[in-house]
C-alpha cells in the first residue's frame, strides 16, 4: 500500500478520471468498469463479499479485524457485511486518499505483528464501516457490476462464459473466477 500510495501521488497531476484496485491473480474484465461506474464527480465503490454471513460470523474477516484492531473493534463491526478488498473502484482523488489511508495503517509499527495474507481486507472493512473513506458506497452483490464469485450470487453462463448479477446485468469485473474451474479454464485459454 505504501508503494501504491506513492505512485498515485506521483500521478496526481495527470488528470486520471478513476482508479481500480484489484487482486491481479483472480480478476478478469468483461467491459470497461470506469464507463459504467464513474458517473459522478466523487465516489469510492466497495463491493460486498460473501453476503450470507457477517464479519462476526466469519473467522477470517473477524480474525483480521481482531488481530489488527482488537476484540472491541471486531465486536463493534460484528454485525456488518463483509466488504471484499479484492476489487474497489473510485474516482482518482478518492482512490488516492484511500490508498494513503491504507498505507498509513499498514506502515504503523503496531500493525506489524498482525500482518499476514489477506489482512488488508480487515483494514478495508474497518475503513469502510467506520466511514473513514470519503464518498464511499458499499454495493450489494445483487446489483453490482463487480461480481465476487466467492459470494455465490452471480450467474455464469456455461456457453458464453459471461458473468451476470442476479438482475441479469452482465458485470464489468469478475473477481475470484477461480471458484469456477470451467470459467478459469476459459480465461486461461482465452488470455
Please provide the spans of the model-predicted regions.
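Short amphipathic alpha-helical surface micro-motifs
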Residues: 26-28, 68-72, 150-158
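GT-A fold catalytic core of metal-dependent nucleotide-sugar glycosyltransferases
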Residues: 1-60, 86, 96
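Short, flexible, basic/aromatic active-site loop/helix in glycosyltransferases
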Residues: 61-79
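Compositionally biased, intrinsically disordered low-complexity segments enriched
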Residues: 39-44, 68, 177-178
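Short polybasic/polar patches that bind polyanions
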Residues: 9, 73, 129
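Catalytic core and acceptor-binding pocket of nucleotide-sugar-dependent glycosyltransferases
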Residues: 76-189
Amino acid at each position: 500500500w505504501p508503494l501504491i500510495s506513492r505512485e498515485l501521488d506521483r500521478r496526481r497531476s495527470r488528470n486520471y478520471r478513476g482508479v481500480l484496485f484489484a487482486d491481479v491473480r483472480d480478476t478478469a474484465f468483461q467491459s470497461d468498469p470506469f464507463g459504467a461506474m464513474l458517473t459522478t464527480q466523487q465516489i469510492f465503490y466497495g463491493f460486498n463479499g460473501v453476503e450470507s454471513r457477517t464479519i462476526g460470523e466469519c473467522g477470517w474477516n473477524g480474525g483480521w479485524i481482531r488481530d489488527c484492531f482488537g476484540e472491541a473493534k471486531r465486536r463493534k463491526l460484528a454485525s456488518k457485511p463483509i466488504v471484499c478488498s479484492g476489487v474497489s473502484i473510485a474516482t482518482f482523488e478518492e482512490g488516492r486518499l484511500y490508498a494513503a489511508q491504507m498505507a498509513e495503517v499498514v506502515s504503523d509499527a503496531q500493525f506489524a505483528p498482525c500482518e499476514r495474507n489477506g489482512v488488508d481486507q480487515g483494514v478495508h472493512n474497518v475503513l469502510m464501516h467506520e466511514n473513514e473513506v470519503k464518498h464511499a458506497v458499499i454495493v450489494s452483490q445483487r446489483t453490482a457490476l463487480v461480481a465476487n464469485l466467492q459470494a455465490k450470487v452471480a450467474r455464469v453462463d456455461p456457453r458464453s462464459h459471461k458473468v451476470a448479477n442476479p438482475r441479469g446485468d452482465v458485470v464489468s469485473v469478475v473477481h475470484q473466477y477461480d471458484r469456477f474451474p470451467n470459467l478459469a479454464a476459459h480465461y486461461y485459454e482465452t488470455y
